[in-house]
């Protein structure tokens, strides 16, 4: 019930922040009972609709991860997002934390909830593995766990931090209706500092055919080390709509010497434009400190 189920419509900033939080919820719906033209719809906030659209578009982008987490919740009851103290139980500093949460296992969400806020303090929980780090989702800046960082924010901001070991599948093609559209270009963000795995789940999204095996579970496993190894293992008979895959691997140290797929070296591009034009290959972004593979 984004915006409130009944009562007066919220002011624009509050509505934007409400949407920015709601996009990570299992059920996301903007509606109310009002019939007197005070119903909370995005187009009622003409000066804020850009930020509302950006947030909703981001939820669509995250839909491969969201759907996979929903299937996991169905199987074992683990919520798609949890308070930080549930994930980092050995860090007492998280016990009083009541706003930030983990979306899945590896994405820390720190929504802006104070009116007019320009700086958002974010506590990055301590981890048991000393090799783990947190990375700003947007800039890829690296942070050690167990500290509070100050994040500059504006009305468009949704502060996010990627935890070491993250495997976050996203849609590389724009989506607007999941009943009629599918992810055809799969983008996977990884932070391969530590060993990790994530199971991407797909089915037709409409029927119960998955009960008869019409699903596809793709286990994506990362083996960290001097040589990073990523493996994909499939289970199920559902035919995926994915036609292309793009890996974005946070690699802070330096560019790798080579990248192989099934034992065959991919071409290395020094210029991003040529990489974007190529059908396959890899490129190292100095700005983002990441290896980009397709």
Task: Tell what function each PLM region has.
Residues 162-264, 273, 285-286:
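Accessory, solvent-exposed terminal regions and/or long lumenal/extracellular loops of proteins
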Residues 108, 120, 167, 227-230, ...:
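Hydrophobic residues embedded in beta-strands of well-ordered beta-sheets
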Residues 159-162, 294:
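Generic detector of short, aliphatic-rich beta-strand segments that form the cores of beta-sheets
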Residues 125-139, 248-267:
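Solvent-exposed beta-hairpin/edge-strand motifs
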Residues 31, 45, 74, 176, ...:
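Histidine (H) residue identity feature
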Residues 2-156, 163:
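Catalytic-domain carbohydrate-binding cleft regions of carbohydrate-active enzymes
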Residues 56, 79-84, 93-95, 133, ...:
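N-terminal start-of-chain detector that recognizes signal peptides
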Residues 135-155, 260-292:
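Solvent-exposed beta-strand/loop surfaces of large extracellular or lumenal domains
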């Amino acid at each position: 019930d984004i915006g409130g189920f009944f009562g007066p419509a919220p002011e624009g900033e509050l509505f934007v922040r409400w949407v920015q939080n709601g996009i990570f919820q299992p059920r996301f719906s903007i509606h109310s009972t009002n019939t007197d033209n005070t119903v909370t719809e995005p187009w009622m906030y003409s000066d804020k609709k850009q930020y509302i659209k950006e947030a909703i578009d981001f939820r669509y982008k995250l839909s491969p991860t969201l759907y996979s987490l929903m299937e996991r919740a169905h199987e074992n009851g683990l919520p798609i997002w949890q308070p930080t103290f549930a994930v980092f139980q050995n860090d007492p500093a998280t016990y009083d934390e009541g706003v930030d949460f983990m979306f899945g296992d590896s994405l820390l969400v720190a929504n802006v909830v104070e009116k007019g806020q320009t700086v958002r303090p974010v506590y990055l929980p301590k981890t048991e593995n000393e090799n783990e780090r947190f990375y700003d989702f947007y800039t890829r800046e690296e942070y050690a766990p167990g500290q509070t960082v100050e994040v500059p924010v504006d009305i468009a901001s949704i502060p996010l931090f990627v935890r070491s070991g993250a495997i976050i599948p996203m849609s590389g093609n724009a989506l607007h209706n999941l009943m009629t559209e599918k992810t055809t270009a799969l983008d996977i963000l990884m932070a391969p500092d530590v060993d990790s795995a994530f199971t991407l789940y797909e089915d037709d999204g409409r029927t119960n055919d998955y009960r008869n095996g019409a699903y596809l579970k793709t286990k994506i496993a990362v083996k960290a080390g001097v040589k990073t190894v990523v493996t994909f293992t499939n289970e199920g008979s559902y035919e995926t709509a994915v036609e292309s895959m793009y890996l974005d691997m946070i690699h802070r140290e330096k560019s790798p010497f080579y990248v192989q797929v099934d034992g065959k070296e991919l071409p290395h591009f020094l210029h991003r434009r040529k990489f974007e034009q190529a059908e396959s290959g890899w490129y190292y972004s100095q700005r983002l400190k990441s290896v980009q593979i397709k």
